[in-house]
């Protein structure tokens, strides 16, 4: 079940989470780039890379609930593998340097889901939108849910909290 959270609340929650991490991990508050994998580890999450073999090729990230299997390629075969609760699984292509922005956002997106569903973990996929793909109504409906929108919003705030944006503006003006 989705609960509506205003944009302002999402921003406060995301920024608060990032501040808490930076303060408790003894990271400089003026950091321009949030160590998103460090934040995931700080929250007790593990980030791993696998080659996805899901039918939906838009899936690039997965937040494991410890029960739901993910189809991956291992040694040339497709296997269904159950990752431990709190594991963020990223498609292996996201390791490429040119995918660093998408990799960072996907990790932040899955962190946002984890924080939102802390008391009732459910498996979550992060999908990319392919402008050349002809989506069905059901596919679009799955991508454009309130839960996904909120996770995207919170991910953006986790990566770029207002205090880092303000600092960057001061530094470059």
Which positions does each model-derived feature cover?
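Active-site hotspot residues in diverse enzymes, especially metal/ion-binding acidic/histidine motifs
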Residues: 1-173
């Amino acid at each position: 079940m989705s609960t509506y959270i205003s944009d302002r609340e999402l921003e406060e929650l995301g920024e608060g989470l990032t501040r808490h991490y930076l303060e408790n991990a003894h990271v400089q508050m003026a950091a321009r780039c949030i160590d998103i994998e460090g934040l995931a580890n700080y929250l007790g999450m593990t980030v791993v890379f696998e080659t996805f073999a899901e039918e939906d090729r838009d899936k690039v990230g997965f937040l494991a609930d410890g029960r739901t299997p993910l189809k991956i390629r291992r040694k040339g075969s497709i296997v269904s593998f159950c990752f431990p609760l709190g594991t963020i699984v990223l498609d292996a292509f996201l390791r490429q340097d040119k995918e660093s922005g998408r990799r960072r956002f996907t990790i932040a997106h899955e962190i946002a889901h984890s924080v939102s569903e802390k008391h009732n973990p459910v498996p979550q996929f992060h999908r990319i939108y392919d402008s050349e793909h002809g989506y069905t109504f059901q596919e679009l409906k799955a991508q454009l849910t309130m839960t996904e929108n909120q996770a995207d919003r919170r991910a953006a705030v986790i990566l770029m909290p207002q205090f880092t944006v303000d600092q960057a503006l001061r530094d470059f003006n």
